Amino acid sequence: MTPLFHLENIVRTYPDPASRDPHAVRTVLNLSELDIRAGEILGIRGHNGSGKSTLLRIIALLEPPDSGTVLFEGRPAGTDDLYLRRQVTLLLQTPYLLSRSVASNVAYGLRVRGIRNASELQNRIAASLLAVGLDPAVFLHRRRHELSGGECQRVALAARLALRPRVLLM
């Protein structure tokens, strides 16, 4: 069976800020092969700067590798493929929320994707908040500055779940 993701010979470098040579690079990811199957839960661990976040951004199709192959369901996947990018969503450790209400934060991605029907927006917002343990009656109109750090993380997760992605990276 074809894996959901197949990564092969992935290399990602960044400019080396410690070098005086303006062309010097630092390799942060050098991955020979990785298969991720549908439904699989996979943990990635490593030291700071070992490429964990870079790998997640490559899998989420937000950042291209310098070299190597990324396949999604057996077909080439790149950062320019909007359809594939919408199948995957990434929640970073320190999520960014808009300086707006919880409802606006959760609705933002839905609106970007063309969902404008008020009833559908309300249903998805409420369902995703409930899924992360936040009562919509209590949290819907709260603003970012009124939330604890953990509540901000839950709102960010609710925003991702509302999109109904096939793949959720955290």
What are the residue ranges of the model-derived segments?
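Helix-to-loop junction immediately C-terminal to a conserved catalytic motif
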Residues: A60
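Conserved ABC transporter NBD signature motif
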Residues: G68-G78, L84, L134
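Conserved ABC ATPase signature
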Residues: R143-L147, E151
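Hydrophobic anchor residue at the start of the ABC signature
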Residues: L157-A158
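Catalytic Walker B motif of ABC-type/P-loop ATPase nucleotide-binding domains
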Residues: L168-M170
